[in-house]
């Protein structure tokens, strides 16, 4: 059985059809790992597509924590944007118009899952499974629409740098491989 078969998909509804939010205690290690990612980051990216096309892109990322989340929750806002004057950005978005030049996503940490208000490749809500490799690395696994996405995020050198490797399968075929080298520009306030 494939890791990305339909049986491994995470449902967007609470099992049993219950509409209420589940009462889950957030893992303190994951909460700590997410707090280490707060702040402004400069992201230098390489995308390799299934047609062997390789494109580069520079982005800015900002991760913030909500000041007053509900009891037992950890909530975050992720914002991303590219510099308007960047030649690589113009070329990238002209060739791949389904990617967004800027956007905002909100997310809630529930145990070992992250409920996102949207995905990077869709505007629909997405539930992501989290696995912590060690205190510096977490793996995110998402399934939505025709996409299966595996993302490795590793904090490096006292959290001054971050490396992300993202593999995206479309309808079971590896379609996009991304490598992001990120530099912390500012710590959270």
Regions found by a protein language model. Give the residues of each.
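Amphipathic/hydrophobic helical signal segments and adjacent flexible N-terminal regions
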Residues: 1-102, 184-189
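Calycin-type beta-barrel ligand-binding domains and close structural analogs
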Residues: 2-22, 85-189
